[in-house]
């Protein structure tokens, strides 16, 4: 405990001199009327590490319908989707696994200390300004240290508050579609003065998710409908922005999410029975203060409180209702200090502190009441001159694990110990070089070392968890070339090509402890290599006619390299496809804009053993989107129709969890 107090004291001294901003570059700007020196699109080409972006216009023109659909349009991503509007959706990047993917919401990382995997199905696109994926280090060095702790970060940026007038602005929207889907959305925003703005967002989603599916049993084809799949989901946000003066700004957010859903379970022959129910609730509040002085120093301070609950019940459990519920909490604060002595150099120091704890409804689910203190510090330097940009970072991570005692009669010897404390220095470096002075063609290279602390489930879950686990260590290497052509008014082109090699050691996997019980151990070693390619082009025939095309392709080999004598050696890791790709072709015109889009994913295995007959077949999902925008003075109406999986393909992403076949969705959006 004395060590914790000492560390917090040192951190407290650091907090008085640290902070951050949310600009795309690391330039210092006045907080009033922020000017971004590069467009977000161009930054995907100049970045020293792979950066992929979908802004609000992309989401519309590419026919994106939900967060999972949006992520399919980004290279290097593998999605685990359990199907339907309420199905859990997690994402892994370049074979690392979902626990290695961080998710940032309006510049602050989301927390999931229990499983380490963020369920992205809870975040809709209706209030999103853009989504970006950073693989490696972010060129914007003015970020919390926590954003540097994962191999990849998915950034979700919501719509910004208005700055043009003091009139109230109201957005109303309703979506409805197949399988009982309906989702109303409301957003109110207003500038009350030139210093204070406010917005409120509300959203509700209901779906029966009773979609049909087919199941092959030898020569027999079974036709059935998904059952026990209903969902009720609500989400609300309050946001404010206060420009205290030209150099000081305070922003805040209050967020609440509630989803009461049934879990349909796996589809098996002759049965579709399930009594599982899950209610997820999440509340957080966060504030961010930004200031700058002297045109050289900038400071950002963020604080956040997060609470979430997962209430699980199975009414069909033998012997009565099975209740496995969990509650987790986090207190988090971060400060960052940015120093830009001249136009070439930038330096950032960031320090974070987080306290997390977890408790369950029974000692037989979580051993004791674990909690963790986390201290993170990062020092970053960035150098830019003409055609060369170099970035280097050193991250220090400290995890102090403890647990409250459980009654002596209720614990085993392994439960007497908390997880091990962990500390590590993690270096990273990246660079970008412009090949020709008159052409936007760049080569880039990067290296990043990082480690992942075991989650509370991996350390404390009854029988399954082990407090003796070591952290997973990852190394990632990337080389790439990028190109853009934007000098012609009627034609724009963006291309990127990256090759990578990743290495994971001390991988945490579950192995049989005895005939009936599995437990987590460090046994795995994984080698990953592949390529990511993207292409985006727009050709405008006239101000009202244009053709837009975007596409990406990824190849990834994710191999088990732990034991050469094992029959699984060099086999593809479970749920990692070798080939993925997507494309969208859009025709803009004065009448109805039309987009045809598709996703292709190759076959996968649901296990690392590759048992005969268990391979999940690859699939192609093609959709059609038609939309029209009409303007009436200052009011705007948008009508949109989406036909999903229009060729009615039956496929699975997760083994025995069939995805919906052909369906439709209608969206009506009116802005006052």
Which residues fall in each region the model found?
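A beta-strand signature from Gram-negative outer-membrane beta-barrel systems
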Residues: 125-171
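Structural signature of Gram-negative outer-membrane beta-barrels, strongest in the C-terminal barrel
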Residues: 340-356, 361-502, 584
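Flexible loop and strand-edge segments within Gram-negative outer membrane beta-barrel domains
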Residues: 207-213, 222-235, 241-300, 305-330, ...
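Membrane-embedded beta-barrel scaffold of Gram-negative outer-membrane proteins
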Residues: 296, 300-314, 442-448, 452, ...
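Gram-negative outer-membrane beta-barrel transporters
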Residues: 387-390, 399, 494-503, 521-607, ...
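C-terminal beta-signal and adjacent terminal beta-strands/loops
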Residues: 549, 600-607, 615-617, 626-672
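Short, acidic, small-residue-rich periplasmic hinge/interaction motif at the N-terminus
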Residues: 20-60, 68, 98
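Extracytoplasmic beta-strand/coil segments of soluble accessory domains associated
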Residues: 68-109
């Amino acid at each position: 405990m004395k060590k914790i107090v000492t560390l917090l004291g040192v951190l407290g001294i650091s907090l008085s001199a640290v902070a951050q901003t949310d600009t795309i570059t690391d330039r210092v700007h006045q907080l009033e009327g922020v000017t971004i020196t590069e467009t977000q699109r161009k930054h995907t080409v100049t970045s020293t590490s792979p950066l992929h972006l979908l802004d609000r216009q992309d989401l519309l023109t590419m026919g994106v319908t939900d967060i999972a659909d949006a992520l399919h349009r980004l290279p290097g991503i593998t999605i685990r989707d359990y199907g339907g509007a309420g199905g859990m959706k997690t994402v892994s990047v370049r074979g690392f696994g979902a626990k290695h993917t961080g998710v940032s919401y309006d510049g602050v990382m989301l927390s999931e200390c229990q499983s380490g995997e963020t369920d992205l199905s809870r975040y809709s696109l209706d209030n999103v300004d853009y989504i970006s994926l950073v693989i490696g280090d972010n060129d914007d060095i003015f970020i919390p240290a926590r954003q540097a702790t994962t191999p990849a970060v998915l950034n979700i940026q919501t719509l910004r508050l208005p700055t043009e007038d003091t009139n109230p602005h109201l957005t109303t929207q309703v979506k409805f579609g197949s399988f009982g889907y309906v989702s109303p959305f409301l957003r109110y925003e207003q500038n009350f003065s030139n210093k204070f703005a406010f917005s409120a967002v509300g959203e509700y989603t209901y779906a029966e998710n009773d979609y049909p599916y087919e199941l092959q049993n030898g020569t027999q084809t079974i036709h059935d409908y998904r059952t026990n799949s209903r969902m009720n989901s609500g989400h609300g946000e309050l946001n404010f922005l206060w420009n205290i003066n030209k150099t000081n700004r305070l922003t805040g957010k209050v967020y609440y999410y509630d989803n009461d859903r049934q879990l349909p379970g796996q589809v098996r022959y002759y049965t579709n029975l399930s009594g599982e129910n899950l209610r997820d609730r999440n509340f957080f509040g966060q504030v961010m203060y930004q200031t700058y002085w002297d045109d050289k120093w900038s400071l950002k301070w963020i604080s956040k409180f997060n609470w979430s609950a997962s209430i699980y019940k199975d009414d069909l459990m033998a012997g009565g209702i099975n209740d496995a519920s969990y509650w987790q909490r986090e207190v988090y604060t971060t400060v960052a200090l940015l120093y830009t002595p001249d136009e070439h150099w930038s330096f950032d120091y960031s320090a974070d502190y987080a306290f997390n704890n977890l408790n369950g409804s029974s000692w037989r689910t979580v051993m004791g009441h674990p909690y963790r203190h986390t201290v993170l510090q990062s020092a970053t330097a960035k150098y830019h001159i003409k055609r060369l940009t170099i970035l280097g970072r050193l991250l220090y991570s400290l995890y102090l694990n403890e647990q409250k005692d459980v009654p002596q009669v209720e614990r085993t010897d392994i439960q007497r110990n908390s997880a091990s404390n962990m500390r590590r220095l993690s270096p990273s470096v990246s660079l970008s070089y412009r090949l020709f002075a008159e052409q936007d063609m760049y080569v880039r290279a990067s290296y990043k070392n990082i480690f992942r602390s075991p989650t509370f489930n991996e350390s404390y879950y009854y029988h399954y968890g082990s407090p003796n686990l070591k952290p997973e260590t990852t190394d990632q290497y990337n080389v790439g070339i990028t190109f853009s052509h934007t000098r012609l008014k009627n034609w724009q082109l963006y291309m990127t090509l990256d090759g990578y090699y990743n290495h994971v050691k001390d991988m945490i996997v579950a192995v049989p402890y005895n005939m009936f019980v599995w437990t987590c151990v460090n046994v795995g070693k994984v080698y990953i290599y592949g390529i990511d390619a993207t292409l985006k082009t727009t050709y405008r025939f006239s101000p009202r006619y244009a053709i837009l095309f975007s596409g990406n392709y990824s190849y990834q080999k994710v191999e088990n390299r732990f034991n050469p004598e094992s029959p699984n050696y060099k086999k593809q890791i479970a749920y990692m496809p070798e080939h993925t790709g997507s494309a969208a072709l859009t025709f803009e015109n004065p009448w109805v804009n039309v987009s045809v889009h598709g996703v292709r994913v190759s076959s996968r295995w649901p296990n690392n053993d590759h048992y005969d007959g268990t391979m999940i077949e690859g699939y192609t999902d093609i959709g059609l989107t038609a939309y029209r925008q009409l303007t009436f003075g200052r009011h705007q109406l948008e009508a949109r129709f989406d036909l999903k999986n229009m060729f009615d393909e039956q496929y699975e992403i997760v083994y025995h969890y069939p995805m919906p076949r052909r369906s439709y969705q209608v969206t009506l959006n009116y802005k006052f």
